[in-house]
UniProtKB/Swiss-Prot annotation:
Enzyme Commission number(s): 7.1.1.-
Lineage summary: Eukaryota, Viridiplantae, Streptophyta, Zygnematophyceae, Zygnematophycidae
MF terms in GO: NADH dehydrogenase (ubiquinone) activity; quinone binding
Signal peptide range in chain numbering: none
Keywords: Chloroplast, Membrane, NAD, NADP, Plastid, Plastoquinone, Quinone, Thylakoid, Translocase, Transmembrane, Transmembrane helix, Transport
Subunit structure: NDH is composed of at least 16 different subunits, 5 of which are encoded in the nucleus.
Bilayer topology: Multi-pass membrane protein
Protein name: NAD(P)H-quinone oxidoreductase subunit 2, chloroplastic
Recorded catalytic activity of this chain's protein: a plastoquinone + NADH + (n+1) H(+)(in) = a plastoquinol + NAD(+) + n H(+)(out); a plastoquinone + NADPH + (n+1) H(+)(in) = a plastoquinol + NADP(+) + n H(+)(out)
Thylakoid as UniProt keyword: yes
UniProt keyword Plastid present: yes
Function field: NDH shuttles electrons from NAD(P)H:plastoquinone, via FMN and iron-sulfur (Fe-S) centers, to quinones in the photosynthetic chain and possibly in a chloroplast respiratory chain. The immediate electron acceptor for the enzyme in this species is believed to be plastoquinone. Couples the redox reaction to proton translocation, and thus conserves the redox energy in a proton gradient.
Length: 497
């Protein structure tokens, strides 16, 4: 029988993960042969693009299990795995220039990002407690190393230690919750088989509630949802900016997939209870994330608190508990990739040219670098939900799904806090476009403006251009994307009846 690559991609459940692992090994070996080779980034990007293509081939095919049922593949998991590979590829695009100029080892950073990507990919489809925990730790350990990657920077070392201690505590809590689930189910580890144990012990609510609370706390930490967000501002501020960009999307996507599958599959008998818990997390995250973001003076800290509020918006999709809520969550997550990574790319580029990330230092940027000011403005306005940018349509559909599901309080709070977010996003845009020379910051006054060119010349400029283009145009094709996603999720998804 002749080899059919399409059939191979469809029937190999973990083909995308295999591609990324092979790519990781090639980067490792190549760096041993030729340190900081120019091919390292190209190989990493090629592997991630190939993994994304493999996911496209798997899309809309019957659900499949592999490795004795430890990995589940359906359109829901494929969607989130695609989000992770795309966000990793964009993170590498916008980080390569930064790493080279900072004099840090490129191979190590790429290896950590690819390892975290593998952990995130497996976590999205993990179908038993062991696979979930191992995948989560693969993602977490790589993240700790990425945070402390700039080892000569005291702030990076401090951030790494904080993240390690708090991450270790959250892993311990979720492992404790898993031990309760294992005991309640009579020794089962597969997610679908844990349900009977929970149902049989519904008359012992304390045991079930302890297990649920531990799972929610562990996932809340990864989502950086309030009040489990304490690590986020300090880690975001102390970490290298490209690392922060990767965290803001990649780990959040993996945590969302895990939260949706764990809660929907394992705890259907107490659905109303965990809905209340998640509604509370969403409300607190949206309110406090936006209020505190409005007081920040650092761009990285502002985007950190903004990501907390974004987690609150995304949780609305989980609480909906239906195909439309999941579609809204995935749609908004796709728009979030490009507008958030685009904003971080602009912050990285400005930091490389000025050495600062303070909001006041962006004053008057338009006069020196109109293209960078325009790109950052587009991404921030999209994050704020200003039409006709992609962020507006993503938020609109997600909030509509929440309204149709009867989550009126959540939607009202989401709308009010979205208005609050406009204040701190527009504040940056306003300061960049001030025309008074005397109001320019000293950093902008001494800014070495590049020659004006519409064609990107470096990898970071390519990444920013791609994010800005998609953030601008995605809204015009959002309806076909929503329709296709909802139809295929309804046809093949295993977490929705």
């Amino acid at each position: 029988m002749p080899f059919d690559p399409l059939l191979f991609a469809q029937n190999t459940v973990i083909l995308p993960e295999i591609i990324v692992i092979v790519c990781l090994l090639i980067v490792l070996v190549l760096d041993l042969i030729q340190e900081n080779s120019a091919w390292l980034s190209t190989i990493s990007l090629t592997g991630l693009v190939a993994a994304t293509i493999a996911l496209v081939f798997q899309w809309n095919h019957p659900s499949a299990n592999d490795f004795l049922g430890s990995i589940q593949v359906d359109n829901f998991t494929i969607s989130f795995r695609g989000i992770i590979t795309i966000s990793s590829a964009l993170s590498i695009l916008i980080s390569t220039e930064y790493i080279k100029r900072a004099g840090m080892g490129l191979a190590e950073c790429l290896i950590f990002i690819l390892t975290a990507t593998v952990g995130g990919l497996f976590l999205c489809g993990a179908n038993n407690l062991v696979t979930v925990f191992v995948s989560l730790e693969c993602l977490s350990l790589s993240s700790y190393l990425l945070v402390g990657y700039a080892k000569k920077d005291v702030r990076s070392n401090e951030a790494s230690m904080k993240y390690l201690l708090m991450g270790g505590a959250s892993s311990s809590i979720i492992a404790y919750g898993f031990s309760w689930l294992y005991g309640l189910s009579g020794g089962e580890i597969e997610l679908s088989k844990l349900v009977d144990g929970i149902t049989n012990h519904i008359d012992e609510p304390i045991a079930v509630w302890v297990a649920l609370a531990c799972v929610v706390v562990g996932i809340g930490f990864k989502l950086s949802a309030f009040p489990f967000h304490q690590w986020t501002p300090d880690v975001y501020e102390g970490s290298p900016t490209p690392v922060v960009a990767f965290f803001s999307v990649g780990s959040k996507a993996a945590a969302l997939a895990l939260a949706t599958r764990m809660l929907s599959i394992v705890f259907p008998s107490i659905e109303s209870e965990w809905h209340v818990l998640l509604e509370l997390l969403a409300l607190l995250s949206m309110i406090f994330g936006n209020l505190i973001a409005a007081t920040q003076t650092s761009m990285k800290r502002m985007l950190a608190y903004s990501s907390i509020s974004q987690a609150g918006y995304l949780i609305i999709g989980i609480v909906c508990g239906n195909i439309y809520g999941y579609t809204g969550m995935i749609t908004y997550m796709v728009t979030y990739i490009f507008m958030n990574l685009g904003a971080f790319g602009c912050v990285i580029l400005f930091g490389l040219r000025t050495g600062t990330d303070q909001i006041r230092d962006y004053t008057g940027l338009y006069l020196k670098d109109p293209l960078l000011a325009f790109c950052l403005s587009v991404c921030l306005l999209s994050l704020a939900g200003i039409p006709p940018l992609a962020g507006f349509f993503g938020k609109l559909y997600l909030f509509w799904c929440g309204w149709k599901s009867g989550l009126y309080l959540l939607v009202y709070v989401a709308l009010i806090t979205s208005v609050i977010s406009m204040y701190y996003y527009l504040r940056v845009v306003k300061s960049m476009f001030t025309r008074e020379t005397k109001e320019q910051s000293s950093y902008v006054r001494n800014y070495l403006a590049p020659s004006l060119s519409l064609l990107p010349t470096t990898s970071i400029e390519v990444g920013i251009a791609l994010c800005v283009f998609i953030s601008t145009t995605l809204g015009f094709v959002i309806n076909p994307i929503i329709s296709a996603t909802s139809e295929t999720l309804l046809a093949t998804n295993t977490i929705v009846g």
